[in-house]
Amino acid sequence: MSFYHTLQHATASAREHLFNAPIIEACRKGDISRGTYVDFLSQAYYHVRHTVPLLMATGGKLGQEYEWVRGAIAEYIEEEYGHQEWILNDIRACGGDAEAVRHGQPGLPIELMVAFLYDQIQRGNPMGFFGMAQVLEGTS
């Protein structure tokens, strides 16, 4: 079994729990208000704006044995660069105040997640970044 399949298997119940959260169910049914969607986008902005800096930090902390990962990180950076601006554009399109979001602060859960990731990269295992990426990419 590949690592990806092992990871998918090991996290199946947690992913199922997440997908059954009331807000996710409402999204699946298209039963959310514009305000709720703008709130979601606002919090998404606060972590997405850190994706490229986190990837850069990850690449910088990897040992020589992970040189092969750096090329993939460079491609990932190129793919992700500017996505935070897409979110702000979506907020504007929904009638939200994108500049207030740009200059605002995240909620505590997003702040803690981002802080944990920077700490994990600097003091723990930089490859830990990819766990968060797997969760967020898998639910978006």
Stretches with model-predicted labels:
Residues 24:
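His/Met- and acidic-residue-enriched segments that coordinate or traffic transition-metal cofactors
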